[in-house]
Amino acid sequence: MINKSDYICTAPFRYTEVHDKDQWLCCPSWLPVDIEQGLGIKGNFRSEKAEEVRETILDGSYSKCDELQCPYLAELKNNKISARFITKTDKNIKLLRSEPGPHTVNFAFDRSCNYACPTCRLDFIMYKGEDRKLVEKKLKEVNEELAPFVKRLYLSGSADPFFSNSFRKFMIDLPVDKYKKLENMHLHTNGSLWTKELWDRMKSIHKFANSCELSIDAATKHTYENETRIGGNWETILERLEFITQIPTIKRYCFSFVTQDTNFEEMEDYYKLVKAYFDKRKTPTKWEVKFNRVINWGTYDKESFIKKEVFNKQHPQFNEFIEELNKVKELPNVVHNFHDLYEVKNTLI
């Protein structure tokens, strides 16, 4: 097992996730410390509270991080290390402390989406009026204050970027002249609106949009339309994937799968579904399937969420989940955050 104290996770030094009312230095479920101080995006990033979080990385404790949720810390137990980690040296510490601002900004300040996925929201959401004005205000702040040193944009950790009016317009009319250091635009989407016609209108981002994450969470029509992607159409997403997985400028794909009681039996089939698309791809690319634990973002009461946590050893279907996990955990291109279960069920895994 790799010792985390020998390495520095660079995310809290180079990444910020901006929500409409809060701000983070990593995925909120992986590093649950809100750094919003009313200082603006850049000011919050350099605030005393943000620096306190970074010190827990530098001292090797990672005490603010949730090691069960973070797939990158979880992978260390499997002797796998992500590129986000660098060796802890005086030179690297000095380098990280001198960063003028975030390299990566995650646009999570618009929750508009054409789906009402139960793990994410209780109903369909479309930002209008004052809500959209706030989105436009934050976009302006990013364009004017952060653009000069931003290398990566992430759209979006909270909405579907192709559905959000503000994000869609941003991608169509990207102010390239402001983002002189931009190298990558990562698209996180349910994929349903990512059509060739719309993509052709977004030519300004094509050279930057070289990675994406598609969240589908199902391998069957019933589960997709009735359990994990309310508002979705199975035939539509399969058709969209035929196009999306063949885009030559996309060099890295991630297919995420929020694992829960309603879909864990489809883990292996999900992997096969994804692999089949890349078996047909004309040009080589990198792809992965990421199995994550379901997280309660406030959409479940305590009793309901206990039923969702099939990976909890007290869950009546825990052993069945372990059997399904065994089928995929060693497959090529699979990433997951269930490594702690090896110690719980070592005889089965």
Segments (PLM) and residue ranges:
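Short functional micro-motifs and their immediate structural scaffolds
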Residues: 75, 118, 125
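Short pre-active-site segment immediately N-terminal to redox-active cysteine/selenocysteine motifs
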Residues: 64, 69, 112-116, 124
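Accessory C-terminal segments flanking Radical SAM cores
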Residues: 1-88, 104, 278, 290-349
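Conserved C-terminal portion of the radical SAM core fold
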Residues: 152-154, 186, 207-213, 235-349
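Core AdoMet radical
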Residues: 101-112, 123-137, 149-165, 177-195, ...
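Leucine-rich repeat
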Residues: 58, 140-148, 171-178, 201-205, ...
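Short cysteine/histidine-rich metal-coordination sites, predominantly Zn2+-binding motifs
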Residues: 82-95, 133-138
